[in-house]
A protein has these predicted regions:
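Bacterial N-terminal signal peptides that target proteins for export
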Residues: 1-13
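Generic macromolecular interface patches on structured domains
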Residues: 2-5, 18, 76, 101
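Bacterial N-terminal signal peptides
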Residues: 11-21
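Sec/Tat signal peptide C-region and signal peptidase I cleavage site
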Residues: 23-27
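C-terminal-biased regions
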Residues: 28-56, 67-152
Length: 152
């Protein structure tokens, strides 16, 4: 019995050490996130204000501000269904159905260093919301950041 307790303790210790060694690889600084956005999208500085507005609006259930950050039309996945949102007013009128309380809380707590960035855009709240740089012209010389995906 003493031998098996020692073996279990040793195995548990090895697992803890393994996770401790891996954990820092997932941590990233604000600067690393900024650099990744800049590398993939080229306009990291322009994300700051829309992102802050989104986080604050989710905290305060400000449907109008969130609606103004969306690129329309937008397909929203919520409550096991898909909704095609055509306008700001459509979004505001259906806000409580389209954005769950859980998503509002998660986005409202979003930290910049916890953003996930890939070529599709910037993911918030484990994929509940995505923002992307949306081209304003054919050459994509001008773009703006907008909500492009909502998955509750």
């Amino acid at each position: 019995l003493e031998f098996s307790v020692h073996r279990i303790t040793s195995a548990l210790f090895a697992v803890i050490i393994a996770f401790t060694a891996v954990t820092p690889a997932f941590a990233q600084s604000d600067q690393e996130v900024y650099n990744r956005i800049e590398q993939l999208h080229g306009n990291a500085r322009q994300l700051d204000q829309p992102l802050r507005s989104l986080v604050e609006a989710m905290r305060s259930d400000d449907a109008q501000t969130i609606a103004g950050l969306i690129e329309y039309p937008l397909t929203v996945k919520a409550n096991g269904e898909e909704y095609e949102i055509q306008s700001e007013q459509d979004f505001v009128d259906n806000f409580d159905t389209l954005i769950s309380a859980q998503t509002r809380r998660a986005v409202g707590r979003q930290q910049y260093s916890d953003l996930f960035v890939n070529s599709d855009g910037v993911m918030l709240a484990d994929g509940a919301v995505w923002m992307a740089a949306v081209c304003e012209d054919d050459d994509c010389d001008n773009s703006h950041w907008a909500i492009t995906v909502i998955n509750n």
